[in-house]
């Protein structure tokens, strides 16, 4: 008889895959000339995976890892967009000089054995 599965094992594995995907996404963005400002920024009611800057543009980046790039692309729903928007507003409140830059919400989609897909302006930041 098999012992009962560790209930937290799946959560830990998913978390680990997410961290790996974020690291890969950051590498891809840095190769494109972006400079990291923050990683896994959390504020009340929201979280942003990556905050990067290139020139006068700051991008709040949501990273999604799925079995296929298409599945990753459909994983950013209205609730996730709202959470990223809340966190972006909180980050801007802490960094007022950033308001003088171009702000956008990007996405990076990650799938096994595929080059990550960066989608600039993937969605609107609510309330900006």
From Swiss-Prot:
What the entry lists under InterPro entries is as follows: Restrct_endonuc-II-like (IPR011335), tRNA_endonuc-like_dom_sf (IPR011856), UPF0102_YraN-like (IPR003509)
Q: Which domain of life is it from?
A: Bacteria
- Which one Pfam family would you cite for this protein? UPF0102
| Cleavable signal peptide | none
Alphabetical list of Gene3D superfamilies matching this protein = 3.40.1350.10
Identify a single GO molecular function assigned to this protein.
nucleic acid binding
- Detail the disulphide connectivity of this chain as listed in its UniProt entry: none
Family designation: Belongs to the UPF0102 family.
What protein am I looking at? Answer: UPF0102 protein Mchl_0439
Tell me the classification of the organism that encodes this protein: Bacteria, Pseudomonadati, Pseudomonadota, Alphaproteobacteria, Hyphomicrobiales
